[in-house]
From Swiss-Prot:
Keyword Nucleus: yes
The protein, known as: Upstream-binding protein 1
Provenance organism: Homo sapiens (Human)
Chain residue ranges for the region called Disordered: 236-270, 285-368
Modified residues (Phosphoserine): 22, 390, 393
The organism's taxonomic lineage, starting at the top: Eukaryota, Metazoa, Chordata, Craniata, Vertebrata
Protein's gene: UBP1
Length: 540
């Protein structure tokens, strides 16, 4: 019996030893020498880095940092850009911080830099029409600015400038070595730029963008150093506080698992450094692209915004100049310009004194050069589009359709430019046709007969009528246009009469002119006045 128990112990001991030996080999091939978790994470399937980002060894350090003292929204998902709500007209501090490492950019040590703060559109589809959007806002809010600088509250800023032609930008100089804070006020609200305004619309987002420049060798602040921006929405006074509270209450109702997908609300908003790329295409290239496809994809602007593109400054700053409006550019041409200012004495916008059309003088010709096209734009009050059409000749401009011009210039200016290109005049309120009889030197008599024929005079020659276009339906306008068309000195015309029944003469009054039928035909003659050296005109 003892032998049997001993054999059982030996067998059990052997089994345990064999089992331990078999377990000891598991995982040996997965040791540190053969397997590394970092190598697995480096595989392409796990790697989702943006190829445009710098590698760890060459991480760029931004020279400046801008912090806006306004809380971010808690209703923004983790990987989305922060969103900050602002109240219209309220002052918000932007702290301008020197973030350079020791030895970085020694050329600006002890020197001032210039920063331009702007409010721009976040959506690229609105950026394409930014000029027209801002012009429309200016029209509805005359005398107001989209962005202002609260100078009394600001600290460390020097020589602030605002240009009347750039209502969405302010600029100033500052010393990076000193404490600097700029207080800004945004006066436009997000719902002012929504296409349909019936109440309850979702307002469009804006961006607060800061661009900083240093001096070049000529002392001009043109060398770009840094740009950063953040996304905002602007509400009517106290509206931002209510929206922030609403977002916070919505987040409190979410489960803990859902909250993990959202960013926390931060007390301040850090403007994110962004790369510069041309967010607004060259106008010509853009129009050429639109010729085959008129609309942009619905997510086009949003996808670009998420990638972190930065809007270029309006005009590359060339010098730190005062904010007085710059004079309109002038152009010289070796040839005589094909455009001319309309004659103020013409009987209609398209007619000279003799009735000949002067359309050829006003209308831009297909052969017009680029310089002549620029002159034509200036003379026809399209100076704000001279830069947009800087490479357009007369033929290029005339090829644009009405729809093209409306998309480029907006509805109001687009239609006006189209009408100017097609030389469309204002439709006259009244048109009459007048033919002159042989002048008579007899004294005004009570009985005069009308011409025997409406188409021929006594010699059988056909009557030739001239068109008189009346923009004002008054008697003095009739006298002025008759004098202009038939080369009669206006001061010599005493009265204008209309021959009535039985040959009586009726004084032409404003009320009579207003009752003229459109395209009426008249013969007229002149007789000497009895009491002066003037003449009377008789319409028959």
């Amino acid at each position: 019996m003892a032998w049997v128990l001993k054999m059982d112990e030996v067998i059990e001991s052997g089994l345990v030893h064999d089992f331990d030996a078999s377990l000891s080999g598991i995982g040996q091939e997965l040791g540190a020498g053969a397997y590394s978790m970092s190598d697995v994470l480096a595989l392409p399937i796990f790697k989702q880095e943006d190829s445009s980002l710098p590698l760890d060894g060459e991480t760029e350090h931004p020279p400046f940092q801008y912090v806006m003292c306004a809380a971010t929204s808690p209703a923004v998902k983790l990987h989305d850009e922060t969103l900050t709500y602002l109240n219209q007209g309220q002052s918000y501090e932007i702290r301008m911080l020197d973030n350079r490492k020791m030895g970085d950019m020694p050329e600006i040590n002890g020197k001032l830099v210039k920063s331009i703060i702007r409010v721009v559109f976040h959506d690229r589809r609105l950026q394409y029409t930014e000029h027209q959007q801002l012009e429309g806002w200016k029209w509805n809010r005359p005398g107001d600015r989209l962005l202002d600088l609260d100078i009394p509250m600001s600290v460390g800023i020097i020589d602030t400038r605002t240009n009347p032609s750039q209502l969405n930008a302010v600029e100033f100089l500052w010393d990076p070595a000193k404490r600097t804070s700029a207080f800004i006020q945004v006066h436009c609200i997000s719902t002012e730029f929504t296409p349909r305004k019936h109440g309850g619309e979702k307002g469009v987002p804006f961006r607060i963008q800061v661009d900083t420049f240093k001096q070049n060798e000529n002392g001009e602040y043109t060398d770009h150093l840094h740009s950063a921006s953040c996304q905002i929405k602007v509400f009517k006074p106290k509206g931002a506080d209510r929206k922030q509270k609403t977002d916070r209450e919505k987040m409190e109702k979410r489960t803990a698992h859902e909250k993990e997908k959202y960013q926390p609300s931060y007390d301040t908003t850090i403007l994110t450094e962004m790369r510069l790329e041309p967010i607004i295409e060259d106008a010509v290239e853009h129009e050429q692209k639109k010729s085959s496809k008129r609309t942009l994809p619905a997510d086009y602007g949003d996808s670009l915004a998420k990638r972190g593109s930065c809007s270029p400054w309006p005009d590359a700053p060339t010098a730190y100049v005062n904010n007085s409006p710059s004079p309109a550019p002038t152009f010289t041409s070796p040839q005589q310009s094909t455009c001319s200012v309309p004659d103020s004495n013409s009987s209609s916008p398209n007619h000279q004194g003799d009735g000949a059309s002067q359309t050829s003088g006003e209308q831009i010709q297909p052969s017009a050069t680029i310089q002549e096209t620029q002159q034509w734009l200036l003379k026809n009050r399209f100076s704000s589009y001279t830069r947009l059409f800087s490479n357009f000749s007369g033929a290029d401009l005339l090829k644009l359709t009405k729809e093209d011009l409306v998309q480029i210039c907006g509805a109001a200016d687009g239609i006006r430019l189209y009408n100017s290109l097609k030389s469309r005049s204002v439709r006259p309120r009244l048109t009459i046709y007048v033919c002159r009889e042989q002048p008579s030197s007899t004294v005004l008599q009570g009985q005069q007969q009308a011409a025997s024929s409406a188409s021929e005079n006594g010699s059988g020659a056909p009557y030739v009528y001239h068109a008189i276009y009346l923009e004002e339906m008054i008697a003095s306008e009739v006298a002025r246009k008759l004098a202009l068309v038939f080369n009669i000195p206006l001061h010599q015309i005493n009265q204008v009469y209309r021959q009535g029944p039985t040959g009586i003469h009726i004084l032409v009054s404003d009320q009579m002119v207003q009752n003229f039928q459109d395209e009426s035909c008249f013969l007229f003659s002149t007789v000497k006045a009895e009491s002066s050296d003037g003449i009377h005109i008789i319409l028959k």
